[in-house]
Swiss-Prot record:
Coiled-coil annotated residue ranges, if any: none
Family: To B.subtilis YqxG/YqdC.
Gene giving rise to this polypeptide: xepA
Annotated protein name in UniProt: Phage-like element PBSX protein XepA
Its biological purpose: Not known; does not seem to be involved in host cell lysis.
Amino acid sequence: MVKYQYEFPLDKAGKAGAVKPYRGGKNDFVTPVSNLSGVAEILTNAALKATEAYSQLGQDRLGAVLISKVKGWAYADREGTLFIEESDNNNVWTTTAAVNVAAGVLTATDWVYLSKRYYRFRYVNGNLQQSEFVLYQSVGAGEMDVRVNEKTPLQIDFAENQTHDGRLKVEARKTFDFVFHENAESASEGAALPVDGAAHLLVEVYGTAEMSEVKFWGKSVSGQKLPIRGVKTDDATTASSTLGKAEAWAFDIKGFKEIIMEIISITGGTLSVKGTAVS
């Protein structure tokens, strides 16, 4: 078996974490127990104490390149359990997949397709302290989150959005900007955004007002105004209104006919509310 050496920079917590290994000629070398070079990257090689756990720093899969699936490998001289976990806010985590790792056996998870924004690998050691431990990850990018679990061949009728070889005809997402309020000095509903097939909306609230309140509304097919909740982008809190400024809010607007950002009150300056809708 070919063996490679890697240097592991430490993360800000002082422990080898979610960092890409690289070959170097300085110090802190380790030798992986399996030749996975070019297929996987090493997350950690630090041995764990009895019942100790390793948690990868939360990874945002919606970056410049979409990460659609992940796979993990673990090797240890003591048994343990490898988890793949997901989160919507990089705070509360749920287990998507888990595999028991026997002592002295390089063990892999299946490819796991991701559905939430953040993912991480977590390894929980058993009741005996390790002497050897190494954890790898592989990622798959740019794939659609579609899986078929049928064991028998499926009868397929090609739809209008498919080519004859079964490939999807993909349309690019459409985006458009919209101004709800521009330097408003008084309370008002402002302009209503026609949803027109848009699915997501990012709204910015900013201005010089000393005090203000903006309430978030969605109009249903009957014309009724319904409160909608947005997610504040800097801390992932949710609310149906805001008293702040210099903020950005994300909304799921599917099913509504119009979106309204109503200025309920304003004193001592102006306020602007603008958004970008994505189909």
